[in-house]
């Protein structure tokens, strides 16, 4: 009996010592720090008091999108654990919250996991000015404090417009970053983004990126971009997991219709495409738009016009239903058929007939204008000739002196 008591005592001592060591290992990580240059590099480091006890150390990174990555940590003689990561190769979602923790393996083959830490991956390439309200947290680079007040006014007007297009309660406050130009926005987005992008919504972090004009007094670009990107945030709050599978023509059509100043080129592009019979079939606009600038512009123009047609004919509730209903892997055309009871091809034809019928009539008139002009001239000549003959006859009969 005494023998077993001794054995149990030694075993419990060993287990308690092991657990204590592991807890101690996690607790003795100190000076945990991160330092990064946006889009370039990230350094994560911590200090451990007993480096000789460490066999291996691993850094875990996880973004709020759920992506998990692991990186080895160097272990220096003074206990510094460090990992340097190239953000050109290991991209982090812009403005995401990044969580990280350390897995430590000891020379006795036990292991320990540290508590979780986090940092916000914001764009630190610029010196940002800010203006906060209960509605918006706005950041910009160029312009005085009064510029921030103007941005607040534009943003509030834009949100009102967006919620009229899509009546959804927004998640407040919304964060807005106003970049000096469109190229700055393109630089931080995925390399697959086309070079015509001037703004972007990041709905998972309730944030939008927009670009200012060279002339800071000209706010029209922002008055167009801000409500457009706000609409994408509203779409996301309505669709959630369905956002990425929603038809591109629907998402962009709603957002384009929310713009304070409609793009004056869109009407011209639609008429030109209709005249040349080069309209893009709507089923080809279910996914991402073409990177070609001209085709993309036509895609936006068609989407806006098509969504306007659907809303006017079937009502706004059908549009919301289309956003809220999971596609369940259905093709875009079949998905639309389930909601509207009409397939996408038939809706496309009906939209073209309703939208371009008047244009076709005008085009026919334009095509035959020489004949019409000649006919009008002949009628005018005939009228004058008749009047002349009547007057001559009256004069010959002595009725006119």
What does each model-found stretch correspond to?
Residues 360-401:
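C-terminal single-pass membrane-anchor helix
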Residues 127-243, 247, 331-335:
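Juxtacatalytic substrate-recognition/specificity segment
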Residues 195, 199-209, 220-225, 230-233, ...:
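Acidic/His/Gly-enriched intrinsically disordered linker/tail segments
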Residues 10, 15-128:
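Glycan-association/targeting regions that enable binding to alpha-glucans and other polysaccharides
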Residues 2-20, 373-387:
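Sec-dependent N-terminal signal peptides of Gram-positive bacterial secreted proteins and lipoproteins
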Residues 58, 173-175, 348-350:
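Residues at or immediately flanking beta-strands
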Residues 55, 98, 134, 172, ...:
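Residues that flank catalytic or metal-binding motifs in active/ligand-binding sites
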Residues 119-130, 357-368:
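Short domain-boundary/entry signatures in modular proteins, especially
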């Amino acid at each position: 009996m005494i023998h077993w008591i001794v054995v149990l005592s030694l075993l419990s001592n060993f287990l308690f010592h092991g657990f204590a060591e592991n807890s101690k290992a996690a607790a003795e990580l100190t000076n945990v720090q991160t330092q990064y240059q946006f889009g370039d590099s990230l350094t994560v480091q911590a200090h451990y008091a007993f480096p000789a006890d460490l066999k291996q150390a691993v850094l875990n990174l996880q973004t709020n999108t759920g992506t998990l990555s692991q990186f080895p940590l160097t272990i220096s003689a003074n206990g510094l654990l460090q990992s340097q990561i190239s953000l050109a190769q290991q991209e982090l979602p812009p403005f995401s919250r990044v969580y990280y923790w350390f897995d430590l393996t000891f020379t006795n083959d036990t292991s320990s996991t540290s508590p979780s830490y986090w940092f916000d991956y914001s764009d630190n390439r610029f010196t940002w000015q800010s203006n906060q309200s209960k509605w918006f947290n706005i950041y910009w680079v160029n312009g005085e404090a009064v510029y921030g007040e103007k941005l607040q006014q534009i943003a509030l007007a834009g949100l009102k417009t967006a919620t009229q297009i899509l009546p959804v309660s927004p998640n407040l406050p919304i964060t807005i970053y106003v970049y000096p130009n469109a190229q700055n926005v393109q630089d931080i987005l995925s390399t697959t983004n086309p070079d015509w992008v001037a703004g972007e919504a990041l709905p998972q972090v309730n944030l939008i990126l927009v670009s200012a004009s060279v002339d800071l007094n000209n706010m029209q670009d922002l008055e167009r971009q801000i409500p457009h990107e706000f609409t994408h945030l509203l779409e996301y709050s309505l669709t959630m997991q369905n956002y990425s599978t929603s038809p591109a023509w629907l998402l962009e059509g709603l957002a384009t219709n929310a713009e304070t100043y409609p793009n004056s080129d869109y009407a011209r592009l639609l008429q030109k495409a209709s005249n040349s019979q080069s309209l893009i079939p709507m089923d080809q606009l279910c996914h991402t738009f073409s990177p070609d600038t001209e085709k993309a512009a036509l895609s936006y123009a068609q989407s806006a016009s098509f969504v306007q047609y659907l809303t006017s004919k079937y009502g706004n509730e059908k549009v919301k239903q289309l956003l809220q209903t999971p596609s369940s892997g259905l093709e875009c055309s079949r998905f639309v058929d389930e909601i509207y009871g009409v397939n996408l091809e038939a809706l496309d034809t009906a939209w073209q007939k309703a939208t371009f019928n008047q244009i076709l009539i005008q085009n026919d008139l334009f095509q035959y204008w020489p004949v019409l002009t000649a006919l009008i001239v002949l009628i005018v000549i005939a009228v004058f000739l008749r009047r002349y003959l009547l007057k001559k006859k009256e004069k010959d009969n002595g009725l006119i002196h």
